[in-house]
Structure formats: C-alpha cells, structure tokens
C-alpha cells in the first residue's frame, strides 16, 4: 500500500468516486462531494492506495485556528469498510501528521468526533487524544479531542 497526496491533477474520477462512496458509507455525518473535492483542491488530503483501491483517506488543515492560535486539525478520516480493524486509521493519523513535524513543531493536533461514535473515540483515546472542554464548532453533540503533535507521532 502507498500513501499519496491527492491533487486535482492526480485524482481520477475513479479515485474520487471511491472517496465519495467511503464517505457516504461511514454511517455518520458525511461531507457532500463538493466539499470533499474542495479539500482535495486545497492540498492536504492523503489517500492510502491498495493498488487502484482507496483503503483510507484523511484531510488535514495544517493551519487551523478553530481551537488554538494554530493547530493541525483533522478535518476528516475514513477507512473503507473492507479495510477496517487493520490499524490503518492509526497509521494514517501518525504518518500524515508526521509530514508536518518540522514545520509545525510544538503544535496540538485537534479533531471533532461525534459523542456517539464510540469506536472512533476509543481509537483516538488509544492514540493518546484526550477530550477537551472546548465546545465543538461542528455541533453540540461533537467532542473536541487534542494531542500534542510530538506525542502522536512518537
């Protein structure tokens, strides 16, 4: 498997259709296709490719100001159903956030998670994320979780 940075130039219709399908099949809050495309156009969406199949994708905002003066914010991460429970989400979080280690030293990594999404919360807690008392900008039922970048990638 290989991680690639998605751009409008290298994101084929087939790859984008897979990303939309993964997003639609996650069963929780989903971003519409135009928002997913905007994330790719901005330049911080990574896909884990298993040959021509998207196994996992993650979108990172490297200059988020939602909760701190500046943080790495995980906008979205989704694993295709056939690839779940294989540690791919953990690997993608650590690896892709690690790409920013030099330029974003001493920053926090933040994410919003639905309070009812217990499997995601368990994953994030296992990685060392903690629930913050900051209110989520995504909705009343979402929790903000944080971890120092250095701790996540070590």
Segments from the language model and where they lie:
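Acetyl-CoA-dependent GNAT
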Residues: 4-82, 93-95, 99, 103
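Conserved N-terminal glycine/acidic-rich loop preference
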Residues: 73, 119-131, 135-136
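Conserved hydrophobic beta-strand within the GNAT/NAT acetyltransferase core sheet
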Residues: 74-77, 109-113
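Conserved glycine-rich acetyl-CoA-binding loop
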Residues: 80-94, 114-122, 126-127
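Conserved GNAT acetyl-CoA-binding A-motif
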Residues: 100-112
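Conserved beta-strand-loop-alpha-helix junction that forms the acyl-donor binding cleft
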Residues: 110-121, 136-142
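Terminal substrate-recognition subdomain of acyl/acetyltransferases
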Residues: 136-154
